Amino acid sequence: MRCAFASVLLVAALAVAGCAQGGTSDTDSAAKFSGAEKQIATTVEDLQTAAKDKNGAKICASLITIQLQQSVAKQSAGKGCSSAVDKAIKQTDPVDYIVKDVKITGDSATATVQSKSDKDVVATEQWTLQKQAGRWKISSTPA
């Protein structure tokens, strides 16, 4: 199933971009937002911190949607979401995230996220988030 495999790659990419060995910036992009927009930006920053701390369990349990977590777990050859994310974190280079914009529609949101690697490669992407159990969680990024 290509979609399910893409989900594993997505979470791996999230963990990777979340800085496998720690990001290069101390930028607090959530500081420029307020309310729900700040919560969304904080979720992105929390992903970066969890990856820096090599905490795949936190990424899977707290920062991605239940659907994405289940999809990754299903595709991880029985090892679970946390193991798949931990493995991805170990195999990647650091990247920093900066949330540039947030648009909210009900319990769905789109965040414009800029990522920058140690090699100064910059990409700007649209991430989607869903509000689940009172917290904004990442549901997808461009694969």
Predicted regions span which residues?
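Surface-exposed, charged secondary-structure patches
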Residues: G78-T124, A143
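Sequence contexts marking disulfide-bonded cysteines in secreted/extracellular proteins
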Residues: A20, I59-L63, G80-A84
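Short, well-ordered alpha-helical segments enriched in acidic and aromatic residues
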Residues: D53-S71
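Bacterial lipoprotein signal-peptidase II cleavage site
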Residues: A15-A30
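Short beta-strand edge/turn micro-motifs at domain boundaries
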Residues: V122-A143
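Sec-dependent bacterial lipoprotein signal peptides
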Residues: M1-G18
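Short, aromatic-enriched amphipathic alpha-helices that serve as compact interaction elements
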Residues: S34-K54
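Hydrophobic pocket/interface hotspot
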Residues: L47, I59, L129
